[in-house]
Amino acid sequence: MVKVGVNGFGRIGRLVTRAAFNSGKVDIVAINDPFIDLNYMVYMFQYDSTHGKFHGTVKAENGKLVINGKPITIFQERDPANIKWGDAGAEYVVESTGVFTTMEKAGAHLKGGAKRVIISAPSADAPMFVMGVNHEKYDNSLKIVSNASCTTNCLAPLAKVIHDHFGIVEGLMTTVHAITATQKTVDGPSGKLWRDGRGAAQNIIPASTGAAKAVGKVIPELNGKLTGMAFRVPTPNVSVVDLTCRLEKAAKYDDIKKVVKQASEGPLKGILGYTEDQVVSCDFNSDTHSSTFDAGAGIALNDHFVKLISWYDNEFGYSNRVVDLMAHMASKE
């Protein structure tokens, strides 16, 4: 089992760690975070307002974080080049600070003995992989990769199924997205993106997202055919993608439901879900799928123009894919 270090013990860092312990697919051996001391790590890992208390044991012992009896080395380095991943036995590093998202910046981890880096965010220049969509294109000459964004992980599997069966001529995506850490609790300064600085709990905030364009990077045939935007809404977790697209081949809405359901039970099982239930966002909290197609929510204007709806736990589904990508990469060593 591949040994993993986590850089940045925020929402994604902690939930990747949870997902690793839940699934047993990778072995977490080290964590670096300069802003959280060991005792605080114990507390933050144990208690989670969104996903509930960790079902297991967490304690600090001999300067290490001990989860379910397993000791994890703790570093508190600000500069990624100074983290001694090699000494801790970490072969792969999850870069989940949200800061070091380029090849150059994430590459600093290699100096400390890591063999590969997985950026848990979209990257301007690192190759992006979405499980179930283009993970087979990974080859082990790549030292630094990106797991794309939570929204790309929701949209891409659905877009792939639709494009493979009916062909997407063009499409627009909207994600109605839960609050994340980059937002402000009350109105505050936000650099160039003034709207993003408005109170997160009080507003529906139109925002940009590169998620739809990024689908063109993981599904090259869709390059230039999709774009999109986001509305940030006052919910703590779980988001939903609305893909409105023009189809090449005529398709009844029932035909679309059928192929998505087949994919969810076959090649994309565990990644793309399917439901005909009368669900709402809360029903997907702590759901491990990248995307769950809501058959009852979508609509067709005609046989060539449809609106498709898919839910995702933007924290936990994504964190589980980070683990899956690392396990896939390890299988290619």
Swiss-Prot record:
Chain positions with Phosphoserine modification: 120, 146, 149, 239, 310, 331
Q: Which family does it belong to?
A: Belongs to the glyceraldehyde-3-phosphate dehydrogenase family.
Q: Which UniProt keywords apply?
A: Acetylation, ADP-ribosylation, Apoptosis, Cytoplasm, Cytoskeleton, Glycolysis, Immunity, Innate immunity, Isopeptide bond, Methylation, NAD, Nucleus, Oxidoreductase, Phosphoprotein, S-nitrosylation, Transferase, Translation regulation, Ubl conjugation
CDD domains on file: GAPDH_I_C, GAPDH_I_N
- Where does it reside? Cytoplasm, Cytosol; Cytoplasm, Cytoskeleton; Nucleus
Tell me which residues are marked as the site Activates thiol group during catalysis: 177
Give all N6,N6-dimethyllysine modified positions. Answer: 3, 64, 192, 213, 225, 258, 261, 332
User: What stretch of residues is annotated with the motif [IL]-x-C-x-x-[DE] motif?
Assistant: 243-248
Fill in the PTM field for this protein: ISGylated.
Residues that the record marks as modified (N6-acetyllysine) are 59, 192, 217, 225, 252
S-nitrosocysteine modified-residue sites: 150, 245
Name this polypeptide is given: Glyceraldehyde-3-phosphate dehydrogenase
Q: For the modification Cysteine persulfide, which residues carry it? A: 150
- Catalytic reaction(s) noted: D-glyceraldehyde 3-phosphate + phosphate + NAD(+) = (2R)-3-phospho-glyceroyl phosphate + NADH + H(+); S-nitroso-L-cysteinyl-[GAPDH] + L-cysteinyl-[protein] = L-cysteinyl-[GAPDH] + S-nitroso-L-cysteinyl-[protein]
* GO MF annotation list: glyceraldehyde-3-phosphate dehydrogenase (NAD+) (phosphorylating) activity; microtubule binding; NAD binding; NADP binding; peptidyl-cysteine S-nitrosylase activity
> Pathway membership of this protein?
Carbohydrate degradation; glycolysis; pyruvate from D-glyceraldehyde 3-phosphate: step 1/5
GO BP terms in the entry: glucose metabolic process; glycolytic process; innate immune response; microtubule cytoskeleton organization; neuron apoptotic process; peptidyl-cysteine S-trans-nitrosylation; positive regulation of canonical NF-kappaB signal transduction; positive regulation of type I interferon production
For this protein, the activity regulation entry reads: Glyceraldehyde-3-phosphate dehydrogenase activity is inhibited by fumarate, via the formation of S-(2-succinyl)cysteine residues.
Q: Which residues bind D-glyceraldehyde 3-phosphate?
A: 149-151, 180, 209-210, 232
* Residues with S-(2-succinyl)cysteine modification: 150, 245
Positions modified as ADP-ribosylcysteine? 150
In the Enzyme Commission scheme, what number(s) does this protein have?
1.2.1.12, 2.6.99.-
N6-malonyllysine modified-residue sites: 192, 213
